[in-house]
């Protein structure tokens, strides 16, 4: 496995290498533009400034990064609201300590210029969803816009059925399927970002063990501080340093897709939401998502959802 190591050049830092913490961060997918802030923090030396030597562990379809967290093989894992609630539901000792995406990049897409410009226009239309989509956000969209399960068709990560049917809708990820469809079919789909329609899940959360939270809160503070610096730099300055490191770990990632992802995160305020501090979370937001999940039957019984997160570090 390729390792990205923060290398120190100053004599002061070199003299204090013994004080550095070796930290592993596992990703929720293969390295991509949505992870750019963490890579920017490596490239710009922000982790090094906080005495952290960071190794990034790629995720992917055959990589169980949550198992790595549970086995104490990594200090931090990237997750989301649902995963943290599942920890709380099962009384597992893992907790979300920050959220670097105020908005989940999950989208539904429609064709342009066909009158499907808002989720309220979805009635009676074919909707291509994966099993994940059915289990995670479908109930929310269905209830809010009075849709029906009869509209659903399976989405198996092949967009051709959607491309062929101008009256259909398909799920996607903000920087992935819209980009691929534009390249394959020559049109930019209409993007309906679920977060902009009230779906309140956090994404790119940082998960840590309760043991680490109790025994080494200083490490968490330093890691999150450096990560915030990386995200601020990535969004506001030249992202190329992050792109270069992402492509070292994921050589199959095209440069134009990285540029597209970066621009869409800024356009849709994925990281900053409505002006929230980068990485921050709120108790009200967690409560809202939990209560919505219970109402939709995702959880068959109530539990202490506050165990899913801590605001000790994020705000």
Predicted segments — roles?
Residues 20-21, 313:
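Bacterial Sec-exported substrate-binding components of ABC uptake systems
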Residues 215-298:
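Secondary-structure end/capping motifs
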Residues 82-83, 157-252:
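Pocket-lining segment of extracytoplasmic ligand-binding domains
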Residues 1-11:
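Sec-dependent signal peptide recognition
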Residues 22-155, 159-164, 168-175, 200:
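Short, glycine-/small- and polar/acidic-enriched structural segments
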Residues 289-291, 295-315:
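Hinge/cleft segment of the Venus flytrap/periplasmic-binding protein
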Residues 14-15:
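N-terminal signal peptide c-region/cleavage motif recognized by signal peptidases
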């Amino acid at each position: 496995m390729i390792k990205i190591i923060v290398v120190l050049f100053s004599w002061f830092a070199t003299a204090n290498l013994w004080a550095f913490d070796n930290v592993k961060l596992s990703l929720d997918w293969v390295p991509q533009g949505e992870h750019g802030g963490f890579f920017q923090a490596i490239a710009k030396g922000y982790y090094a400034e906080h005495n952290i030597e960071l190794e990034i562990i790629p995720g992917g379809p055959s990589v169980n990064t949550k198992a790595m967290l549970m086995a104490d093989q990594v200090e931090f894992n990237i997750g989301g609201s649902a995963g943290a609630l599942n920890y709380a539901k099962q009384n597992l000792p893992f907790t979300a300590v920050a959220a670097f995406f105020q908005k989940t990049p999950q989208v539904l897409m429609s064709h342009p210029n066909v009158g499907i410009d808002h989720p309220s226009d979805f009635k009676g239309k074919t909707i291509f969803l994966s099993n994940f989509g059915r289990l995670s956000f479908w109930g929310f969209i269905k209830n809010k816009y009075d849709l029906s399960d009869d509209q659903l068709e399976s989405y198996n990560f092949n967009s051709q059925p959607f491309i062929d049917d101008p009256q259909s809708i398909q799920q996607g990820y903000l920087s992935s399927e819209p980009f691929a469809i534009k390249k394959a079919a020559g049109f930019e789909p209409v993007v309906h970002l679920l977060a902009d329609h009230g779906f309140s899940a956090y994404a790119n959360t940082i998960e840590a063990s309760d043991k680490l939270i109790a025994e080494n809160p200083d490490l968490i503070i330093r890691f999150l501080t450096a990560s915030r610096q990386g995200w601020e730099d990535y969004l506001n300055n030249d992202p190329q340093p992050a792109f270069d490191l992402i492509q070292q770990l994921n050589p199959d990632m095209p440069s134009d897709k990285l540029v597209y992802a970066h621009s869409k995160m800024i356009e849709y305020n994925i990281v900053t939401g409505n002006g929230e501090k980068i990485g921050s979370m709120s108790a009200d937001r967690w409560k809202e998502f939990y209560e919505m999940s219970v109402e939709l039957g995702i959880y068959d019984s109530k539990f202490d959802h506050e165990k899913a997160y801590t605001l000790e570090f994020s705000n």
